[in-house]
Amino acid sequence: MSLNLLVNQEELKRYLDEYGVWSKIFRALFVARNSKPLRSFCVHYAIKELKEKTYNLELYQSLFEEFQDCFENEQLDVEWVESVTFHRKQNLEQLRRELKAYKNNLIRESIRAAQLDLASFFADVGQFDSALRSYAKVREYCTNAGQIAHLSLELMRISIWIGNYSHVLAFGSRAKSTVSAAMELTSPIYAYCGLANFCLGDYEEALAHFLKVETDTSDGIITKTDISVYISLCALACWDHKRLIQELERNEEFNALSDLDPSLRRCLQAKCNRKYSLLLDTLQQNAQDYSLDMYLAPQLTNLFSLIRERSLLDYLIPYSALPFSKIAVDFHIDENFIEKNLLEIIEAKKLNGKVDSLQKRVYIEPSSEPENFEDIKNIAQTSLLYSKALYLQTLAAMNTENTDDEAPVIAQTNITAEDSQN
């Protein structure tokens, strides 16, 4: 979300309208509980959605109790409550009668459809545990892989609303094994798995799943703009400087998704250009906006910490020793905080170095980035190989010029990797 979106209620409404019914309600209530200036607007938005598109009178009543300050001149809609109570009872009885009749007649497809209708009813009412149990009973009446894929997606969606992300991944595993029969579900399945991994703090797995989501995906729970934010933050936290540059150069999906959020795109470019203070400052400026995303907010502190840690490791690569003062200037961070971060990184064995608290310096051992030294070694060996080849070719050319009919002293060169060691 951009700052303008949060200040302008019309923009906020447009943002919320991109989601499905329950996501609209849950996101609006999350904002209401975390932003006092937007509380009244978001509560009334959620109430409107509840009354128009659901039968969840329990949530409706509880919101009047929780947000009493937003309803000073409003009363509980008793007429709506009575109407919903009546129709809920009527609909539930009818759905159960139909299901029982189909089971007595052993009509398999009709049983499946009736069980789906019952599960959908529980979801509309907001009884997600009952909806989950009803959807689970549909499995035995599915007759093909496509039906199983659609069912698994519904189970994933309900599990997200409940907040059971381990179940999302379990149902996602089943969905991925049957998705070939319903290819249109591929992006939502990977998006839900990515969201579950993200909420569980497994950012690398989240990144891997999000990268398989098509850029034109639009779903009731997570939008392509959300994925752009999550994928960019995960990349900043998980990928080092070298990997990030490679992905931006070669990965079309990552480029397309990260382009959807200009602010985070600037953060990615800042990291590529080693402008770490710009990266961290930009993230901090957007922190308030991110804190109003119900899935991002709980991960924000950990993500920012990992991004800062990854940036610090990338920053230290060229150095053998460095004063805290220079790091503090380049990162716009207090020296004491720098020292604390360095000690944590070294204790976690992510950096092979030592901290001199008296001199306020950090000393980095070469082995802290062994892959870089392996790259340097390979480059040196390759350079030596080409040098030997060039020398022998030059020698052969000179030998040819100095002889008339004789064969060259060196007719061919056969340089191997072993020569580069000599």
Swiss-Prot record:
It comes from Schizosaccharomyces pombe (strain 972 / ATCC 24843). The gene is csn1. PROSITE patterns: PCI (PS50250). InterPro entries: PCI_dom, Rpn7/CSN1, Rpn7_N, TPR-like_helical_dom_sf, WH_DNA-bd_sf. Belongs to the CSN1 family. Component of the COP9 signalosome (CSN) complex composed of at least csn1, csn2, csn4 and csn5 subunits. GO terms for cellular component: COP9 signalosome; cytosol; nucleus. Keywords: Cytoplasm, Nucleus, Signalosome. Component of the COP9 signalosome (CSN) complex that acts as an regulator of the ubiquitin (Ubl) conjugation pathway by mediating the deneddylation of the cullin subunit of SCF-type E3 ubiquitin-protein ligase complexes. Required, indirectly, for activation of ribonucleotide reductase through the degradation of the protein spd1, thereby supplying deoxyribonucleotides for DNA replication and repair. It is found in: Cytoplasm; Nucleus. This is COP9 signalosome complex subunit 1. Residues 202-369 form the PCI domain. GO terms for biological process: DNA damage response; protein deneddylation. Disulfide bonds: none annotated.
